[in-house]
Amino acid sequence: MAECEELVESGGAEEVPRVVAALAGILERVAERNDAAAAAELSAVAAPAASAFRATTKPGISVRAYMARIARFAGCSPACYVVAYVYLDRLLRRGRRLALAVDSYSVHRLLITAVLAAVKFMDDICYNNAYFAKVGGISLVEMNYLEVDFLFGVGFDLNVAPETFADYCAVLQSELLCAEAPPPPLRLQHCCLSDDDAGAGCSAQQQLAA
């Protein structure tokens, strides 16, 4: 649990929490990988287009910058980002039949919606949907629709057991350690989410999207 405490510590006024940097690193890498996969298999591009989370054009802001913006303005506890990570995993595992994937077209909307859901479940005080829509750069109508779609997507399964929270913290901590250490030639990438909440760890991770 010590690594969880270290991971979710609040940084200074100008410092992005470590958990934000870790989650941004994972999702940015997954989006890039899925972009490459979609480019290699053009026949698979049409399937995800129907998702409410998939924008018609790529946002002009990077995943890391977008996460930093959310962290700066959302005013939520760092633990919310771990919970948002859990929610994203649940959504994507359930959404495989709908070909929902994390790529450059969907990652931003998935992030802002996952954080919104986590904040409402975790924090006693939080901003409303109109505020989060402004932070995320989308309309209030879109924010409301994405929230409902997200909740149905996870089956309203919002509770996160302490053991599950710790497991996802461990994955995020591993991401930080890999980012800080000189990478070996063939290092394993921690860019996957676990297949099972209870027992999620680096060795039990599963791809965010096929």
What are these regions (language model features)?
Residues 130-173, 179:
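Channel- or pocket-lining gating/hinge segments that regulate access to a cavity or pore
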Residues 67-70, 84, 150:
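Short alpha-helical scaffolding segments that buttress acidic/His motifs in well-ordered protein cores
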Residues 82-90, 108-120:
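Contiguous, well-ordered alpha-helical segments that form the cores/surfaces of helical PPI scaffolds
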Residues 77-81, 118-126, 158:
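Short helix-interrupting loop/turn segments at helix-coil junctions
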Residues 1-79, 90-99, 163-210:
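Acidic, Ser/Thr/Pro-rich regulatory low-complexity segments at or just upstream of the first helical elements
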Residues 100-103, 121-136:
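Short conserved catalytic/interaction loops centered on acidic-Pro-aromatic/His motifs
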